[in-house]
């Protein structure tokens, strides 16, 4: 999920019922879905996701589950989706903004060809190094160029060199929601025509459809407006074709067409 400590949450998100009371939607970090039925989501995981999950990704998921901010991780079904997507578009040069322990990063690295690359950025190297042994064990660490620190300066440096324009096949953004639009404007210069940008958490725990006065955790409420603005902006942006999917916490794919 995101890279900022303010976006970390306790065990699980909560929703308000008709009486305004709080109720827990899911009881474990393995459940990260907007589906109303826990049983249905567990069926998806048990039937189609976990049996096909590479051992290295399973190990990284289990390591991450012990971290106090484990809700920041990409869900297993979304990791499977990203892995398939990378293969479908034949991506070779990719970027990830917001790494956390690297579950989505590993999903991407495993999908890339041997000479594929990922420019990965996160403000917290410690979290990345927590998952690094799993990435190294999978034999894909050589594909990753990890940069610790804010992503915007790195993007600006890339844009300053003409050779980087339109050079990336795929970018996955799972970081500070208040900068998503800043990332978007820069990434449109760096992603090739026909290339994809994926924005994570675009349904933001389902809060995008809640009334303003609905009970919400503080960090959900704080970033909710940024997500709402992003969704509206992407829907109106004729430089991209978009597809918003209820995978994980919501992911919006943008295909650059201009």
UniProtKB/Swiss-Prot annotation:
It is an enzyme of class 2 (transferase). Residues 1-31 are annotated as: Disordered. Pfam families: Methyltransf_3 (PF01596). Its EC number is 2.1.1.104. Gene3D superfamilies: Vaccinia Virus protein VP39 (3.40.50.150). Transmembrane segments: none annotated. S-adenosyl-L-methionine binds at residues 74, 96, 98-99, 104, 122, 151, 176. Keywords: Lignin biosynthesis, Metal-binding, Methyltransferase, S-adenosyl-L-methionine, Transferase. A divalent metal cation binds at residues 174, 200-201. Residues 1-16 have a biased composition (Low complexity). Belongs to the class I-like SAM-binding methyltransferase superfamily. Cation-dependent O-methyltransferase family. CCoAMT subfamily. This is Caffeoyl-CoA O-methyltransferase 1. The lineage of its organism: Eukaryota, Viridiplantae, Streptophyta, Embryophyta, Tracheophyta.
């Amino acid at each position: 999920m995101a890279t900022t400590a303010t976006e970390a949450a306790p065990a699980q998100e909560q929703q308000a019922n008709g009486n305004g009371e709080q109720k827990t939607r899911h009881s474990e970090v393995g459940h990260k879905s907007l589906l109303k039925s826990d049983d249905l989501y567990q069926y998806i995981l048990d039937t189609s996701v976990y049996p096909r999950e590479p051992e290295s990704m399973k190990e990284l998921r289990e390591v991450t589950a012990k971290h106090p901010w484990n809700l920041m991780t990409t869900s297993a079904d979304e990791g499977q989706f990203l892995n398939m997507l990378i293969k479908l578009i034949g991506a070779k040069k990719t970027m990830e903004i917001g790494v956390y322990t690297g579950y989505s990063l590993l999903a991407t690295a495993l999908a890339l060809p041997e000479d594929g690359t990922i420019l990965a950025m996160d403000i917290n190297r410690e979290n990345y190094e927590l998952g690094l042994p799993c990435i190294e064990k999978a034999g894909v660490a050589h594909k990753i160029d990890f940069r610790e620190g804010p992503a915007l300066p790195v993007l600006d440096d890339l844009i300053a060199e003409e050779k980087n324009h339109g050079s990336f096949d795929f970018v996955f953004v799972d970081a500070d929601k208040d900068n998503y639009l800043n990332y978007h404007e820069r990434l449109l210069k760096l992603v090739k025509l026909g290339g994809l940008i994926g924005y994570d958490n675009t349904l933001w725990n389902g809060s995008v459809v809640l009334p303003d006065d609905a009970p919400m955790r503080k960090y959900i409420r704080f970033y909710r407006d940024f997500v709402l603005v992003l969704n509206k902006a992407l829907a109106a942006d004729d430089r991209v074709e978009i597809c918003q999917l209820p995978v994980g916490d919501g992911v919006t794919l943008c295909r650059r067409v201009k």
